[in-house]
Amino acid sequence: MQENPNITIIGPGAMAEAIIAGLLRQQLTPPENIIASGPRIERGAELHQHYGIQPYQENVLAVKKADVVILSVKPQRLQKVLSELSGAIKPEALVISIVAGASIQTLADGLNHHCIVRSMPNTPAQIGEGITVWYASETVSDEQIELARQILAALGQEILVEDENYLDMATALSGTGPAYIFLFMEALMDAGVHLGFPRRIAEQLVIQTLRGSVDYYENQSVHVADLRNKVTSPGGTSAEALYYLEKAGFRTAISRAIWAAYERSKELGKGLELSLIHI
């Protein structure tokens, strides 16, 4: 694998900062080989001061010598960025996109470039505890696959899939997943306060219960339903609570919500394709 690659990140937001921190933590490349390009001078200065990377405002100049270009912009800014970068990236460079809904074909057409990885990280990636699902175009070399794997591993766990359709599925399940978890946590905390706990104690109980349950599951070699049954005594409090959740359609609501997110992800992707036709 290439040593000390030149890496340019377009769109220096929170996820981009997580990538920068991870790259430096893993010593994948030195800070002087990392460029963060964005319109805000103060943001570039902040990243330079904190990490020692190079801030740019002109995307075309930023990608000129890049071995890897990471697209980390909002979907609504993608059209402008692709228009700027079309034909500007070295043919042998690897492009990694974390733009939600942007397909390999959309990116390839917009950039006039065909060596592309499409990925979907999630919010915990900002502390190195995320999970990223990714797919590589056929033109990505084995060496670049390994480089992409190391870059995405800076965000937490990573899963390379063989079908790009899995990216829309991942958007609905893991990409949007933290929102479901936070809503569930909020509901549990509010229920605890309703029972009479001070909010501080309710929050502590919920957080540790979730953390401990996940750790416990990962240390067992059984199906998650078996663990649920294990803590559900006939006629007990767990059985009563689960009865009400099932009666309220808890499981169905989750399934339908994730399916709706999946359909919305596909819609957004089609919208991006249509908006980029006129580039």
Q: Where are the regions a protein language model picked out?
A:
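NAD(P)+-binding Rossmann beta1-loop-alpha1 motif at the extreme N-terminus of oxidoreductases
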Residues: M1-Q57, L61, G130, V193-L195
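Conserved small/polar residues in nucleotide/adenosyl-binding loops
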Residues: I277-I279
